[in-house]
Each structure stands twice: as structure tokens, then as C-alpha cells.
Amino acid sequence: CCMAGFAQSAEPCDEFVARLPNVKKPLCEAAKLQPTAGRSVNGRTLWVRDINPGNATVRVLVVGAIHGDELSSASMALQWIRMAEQPADMPHVVHWRFIPALNPDGLLNKPPKRVNANGVDLNRNFPTPNWERDAKIYWEKRTRKDPRRFPGPKPLSEPESRFLIEEMQRFKPQLIVSIHAPYGVLDFDGPAKEGFVPPSKLGRLYLDQVGIFPGSLGNYGGVHKGVPVVTIELPKSTRTPLDAEMRQMWLDLLRWMSERLRSEG
């Protein structure tokens, strides 16, 4: 149904470099993105990168560009792949899995758009409890049927959200880091474990828990599935923070993981 007129790129770097801020071809190629069986609505490959040193004690899933017009989120995921390849001074051995662009159709659209090719906000399409009731009411009453926030006809109606759920089931992360823009804050959804403290800041971004939305990844992962979800809202959609700032955010994340995440082997 969906492939007409669309030429699938054999490797993503030409398209990513042309579209993403602060991403040159050597950086993208060094990320060594691997194709998956996952496809977008328009048939684009969903790419991942695994960094697994072996004998990992913690698994962390990093997701960028759930919203296709938040270009900086995919850029920072690619920058962080480079950092994840360096040995880290921390007690955990981490298996990282990066999905830099969950919504490539929105990202590579001209102009880029928040929703996927079906017009669905992927971050409202995850199967949170009472989705059928709450997501529709929230969209109609709170957003006044904003088309940029349409949750879809049913939970997991979209191939991209189904792919992410399947990745979560396969990978079983102990932490999910979801990168967005442009609110310039840090959000956290997590299990109500006593003593579990979210990160207070990453770089210049400070914790400001913005609430729970029906169908969001934070609600699904953090509240429903009990997997902590750190949501990074970069300050700008079309520009990344400075390289030193992205590195500081990375180091702050590692420090928090060292203090708060429990190894499960």
C-alpha cells in the first residue's frame, strides 16, 4: 500500500546528514547503524545501534525523533553513540541500544513534521491503561483535536510504535532515555519505588515533571511497565546544544545511573 513513489535508502547517512543539525557524514558513518526488520509507514528502515561490551549488568534503550520535527533529538542520539563507545568510569557494564530516529517519515518529510505518515503522534499511541477512553477524551477536550497530537485510531495502530514495544520486549531495558525538544527541561516517569530518585539535572536541563499523558512512552514504560523513563527535552528543535554541553549531559546521566540504577545481570 505504502511504497509507491518511495525509494528506500540502503543506508541512512546521506538523508540524515542532509536533514539533521550538527551531524556530519563521518559522525553518522561511525555510528554504524544497523538495519532492522522494522519499517515506517512509508517503508523506511528503522535503524538501531547496539553497543554491548559483553557481561553487561544494565540495559539502556535510547530513543530519538519519536516526533519527526524534533531534529536535534536524533542528532544528539548519534552524538551519544560516539560517547557510549568510550569506556565509562562507572560500576555498571552497560549494554546500550540506540534508535536515533523512530519516526523517519516525519523527520525526512519536507518540511519535517511531528506526526508519522499516517498523521499519528507516536507519543500518544502506546497502550496505556484505559487508552480507548482517555486518549480520545484528552485529544478532543485538552488539545481541541490538535492534528499534531492525534493519538491514532487505537493503541499501537502504527508500525513505529509497535516496533518500539517489540524492542522493549526483546531488549528488556532497565532504563529508557527518550530525547525530545524544545521545552528545555528534564522529565521523569518511573516506578513508585521508595527511595528511587530521578535525576535532578542533566547538563543545564533541570527536572520539571510535566505530567502524564495517555498513550505516551513515559506513561507506558514508567508508570505501566515499571521501567524508568528519563525524557530529555532539548531547548531547540533545529539546533543541538554545544558539543561540550551534550557531553556534560551524558556524564551526568552516567553519574545518576551509577548512583540509582540497580544491576540485574
Kindly give the residue locations of the regions a language model identified.
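Short glycine- and acidic-rich boundary segments immediately preceding or forming the N-terminal edge
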Residues: 5-47
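Short, Gly/Ser/Thr-enriched beta-strand-loop segments that form substrate-interacting elements
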Residues: 35-38, 205-215
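Short beta-strand-to-loop junctions in surface cap/lid or active-site-entrance loops
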Residues: 47-56
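Short beta-strand element of the alpha/beta-hydrolase
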Residues: 57-67
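Active-site/substrate-binding loop(s) of hydrolase catalytic cores
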Residues: 57-58, 71-205, 209
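Active-site-adjacent mobile loop/cap segments within catalytic or ligand-binding domains
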Residues: 186-197, 214-265
